[in-house]
């Protein structure tokens, strides 16, 4: 044994050839700060071996290196800029020394090589991969950019266009694509990986392969003519501006850095990468996006822990087969859980099957599946007008009309047709689960399972625990939701549960702004362009359906009369009474016409202004700051109340529900992350300016206490140790 660290070791394989093996405790390898330091020590040992002829890098895990240890990021990002820059220089010196070894090097890459894992193998001369490879640089999705030389080596290896596509979008690619663009040199079966890598290494040692020529381009300026450079970088900057926008500085920073570094050799190019990385790491956007990643891991880990002792449902059923029911059936069948789809008439069944078939055909058109797979999936969806097959199902989700009497009747009838251990769930969006449970003989087998539309796109499923829902019931539906590829978050019961409960105060803030003379077009523009929502409140109401919102608003007002009962006729009332229901009938805040792809396209409609004039004061202008404050304060206050009341368990789950269920701007990280970034004291000062607007603007006492003590909702993060302690030399 030449060297043994906590996460890697170095040993001789055969005469003159050494292997460096990543083998961290636990299930995966991560390139954390300790591993970078250990890698530097191992390379130091290699540099002393006069008889070294070649080096093989490999992993003892199912994946090569899954990336950096993102749990370290928030503390690293708090390190002062100069110290963070020093540590990056040290880390890059390690990879440079790997790249500069006076012998050929090869990485045998299995499974994932992402982020720092990808940057590590870019420093070797050759890369041989297994068919299950996923390799790439996802850093821009975390609000940063590659910091271990990825923005320097990848463009010089692949050419600017291919590298920019991966780096700016934070993409990873599979084995075939990696081979095609030159990111790996070959793909072999897993059992042949080391043997194949050794064969390449021997050819390089024997002079049959020119490893020095392979290495040289990574040390030099990027080989691009002025015209080629102008075209590549101009197109890339345009694409990034269009897709990422101003709220996500990392992608455009990465492109500009690669452009600036193009004319330099490795050392100066790495300095430019360092100078770009460090300021990005200190942005609120990076903290928010890293926070989302960590919250996502936490939520998924919680679901995994919850379901460890239950069997995932093997057969499901859906009651009510409109667009929503068809979407749920498709998602279940697509993820290998056969589903019975029941309705009371053929027309609805046809609509549900058509929705499922449409979604499968889209997969076919995109080349994700072939005709055989399509036929196989569709054959596992069984439409029926009766309860045939219900005696075999493990879980049933009801998705009928949002009417408590209808839902109770359907659920009570279904309970008599299923096994005693079958779980029933309702896809209600607002009706309390404990109220629906009153119609059942086995309320312990019943809970809420709130999917979001469109089902195939929206990652969140709210799992609602009623007063009598058993732990096993909750675990079973969490297991089914996870199997469907969704992110389940368990909440406690109340009108609207969590997501709709906090959404309707936001809509109430919108209604009050319109009542006070604001223009809905400006509100939408501010909330989209400035705050960052995917759609403004008027457009969102049109998509949700004005009639749906009108009904849900009444349910919420009955549930929380002190805050959500309004004493005036608002814009939603006016549009509802005028039969303007949004996209579903082509008339809402906007008029809708189908574009060439059959999608609704919004257009101005002067008739709306006349309708709104009946329920509004004369038009007046509001500042962007006032619009954002008046829209967001009611939502954030309600989010805090939900945490204080135990409707949602943690700030992490609340923020993920908002991001995954409502499209809360990821660069803000969710309501609690936004609140922490703003500061509770500053938020309180802002909210108190608007408390005259009514109870929705009254800050909860718990938040007032946070403001008094200047406490955050997320646990404070300590800066990483001084860089000297991180072994920088």
From Swiss-Prot:
Task: Report residue spans for region: Disordered.
Answer: 708-729
BP term (GO), one: fatty acid beta-oxidation
Sites annotated Important for catalytic activity: 119, 139
A single Gene Ontology CC term: fatty acid beta-oxidation multienzyme complex
Keyword Thylakoid tagged: no
| Pathway the protein takes part in | Lipid metabolism; fatty acid beta-oxidation
Q: Which GO terms describe its molecular function?
A: 3-hydroxybutyryl-CoA epimerase activity; delta(3)-delta(2)-enoyl-CoA isomerase activity; enoyl-CoA hydratase activity; long-chain-3-hydroxyacyl-CoA dehydrogenase activity; NAD+ binding
Task: Keyword check for Cell cycle, yes or no.
Answer: no
Q: Which keywords, in A-to-Z order, does the entry hold?
A: Fatty acid metabolism, Isomerase, Lipid degradation, Lipid metabolism, Lyase, Multifunctional enzyme, NAD, Oxidoreductase
Q: Where is this region: 3-hydroxyacyl-CoA dehydrogenase?
A: 311-729
Active-site residues from the entry: 450 (for 3-hydroxyacyl-coa dehydrogenase activity)
**Where is NAD(+) bound in this sequence?**
324, 343, 400-402, 407, 429, 453
Q: What is its EC number?
A: 4.2.1.17, 5.1.2.3, 5.3.3.8, 1.1.1.35
Summarize where substrate binds, as residue positions: 296, 500, 660
Segments for region (Enoyl-CoA hydratase/isomerase): 1-189
- Catalytic activity annotated for this protein? a (3S)-3-hydroxyacyl-CoA + NAD(+) = a 3-oxoacyl-CoA + NADH + H(+); a (3S)-3-hydroxyacyl-CoA = a (2E)-enoyl-CoA + H2O; a 4-saturated-(3S)-3-hydroxyacyl-CoA = a (3E)-enoyl-CoA + H2O; (3S)-3-hydroxybutanoyl-CoA = (3R)-3-hydroxybutanoyl-CoA
The UniProt entry, under PROSITE patterns, shows:
3HCDH (PS00067), ENOYL_COA_HYDRATASE (PS00166)
Complexes and interactors: Heterotetramer of two alpha chains (FadB) and two beta chains (FadA).
Entry's family note: In the N-terminal section; belongs to the enoyl-CoA hydratase/isomerase family.
The protein's name in its UniProt record:
Fatty acid oxidation complex subunit alpha
What is the scientific name of the source organism?
A: Escherichia coli O127:H6 (strain E2348/69 / EPEC)
